[in-house]
Amino acid sequence: MIFKNILRIFKSYQLSLIVIIFYELLYFLKGNKGNNFTFSNIEGMTDNIPCPYYFLYKINKKIKNINFNLFIDLGSGSGRVIDFFNKKFENKNFIGIEYFDKQFLYCKENFKKYKNIKFIQEDLTKYNFLQYNADCYFLNEPINIDKSLIGILKKIKESKNNKGSILLILVNCNKNVLKCLEDLQCIETFYINDKKGYSIYYINNK
């Protein structure tokens, strides 16, 4: 079963698989954290498949000169995204919100020395994450029910908690979900097929 799931992941990246594997090996050798993955049997919750380092590398190139203070990863898994950007940005705060025990406890232990990183175990579909007034949100397909994910994105888009601008980064979200964001400024979109890729949006609340 595990082998079939891994094979399914590889097949989903098609012709970009060689590039994906290259960046996975590169950052693994650099000692980056968050390389664990697990498969979910809970309806609505996606497998914990870390965002490819290739995507993170490209996203970083695009946002490295954009100012933000608080980065929230909704569905943070084993912490790969937070670990990656914590090494790229100075003087930033990070919050990871994760539902599953295993991933949450892993992150709590492995990131405990970082005062600027906090992990919270909650169901992001019910949790009031807007209370933190974040100006950067990252979602790597945390939910496989479009209606629920669209509801979360609308909360972020319509948030009155943050009077400034918000950076919104979505990974591996399908086109039906992205339609609800067509009125936002799209900084960059990169997809290798219909389901695998990322989009970066800018919400200007000023």
PLM ranges: what are they?
Residues 135-147:
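A short SAM/SAH-binding and catalytic strip from SAM-dependent methyltransferases
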Residues 146-202:
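C-terminal substrate-binding/active-site "lid" region of AdoMet-derived donor-dependent transferases
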Residues 68-77:
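Conserved class I S-adenosyl-L-methionine
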Residues 1-66:
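S-adenosyl-L-methionine
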Residues 100:
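Conserved SAM/SAH-binding beta-strand->alpha-helix loop
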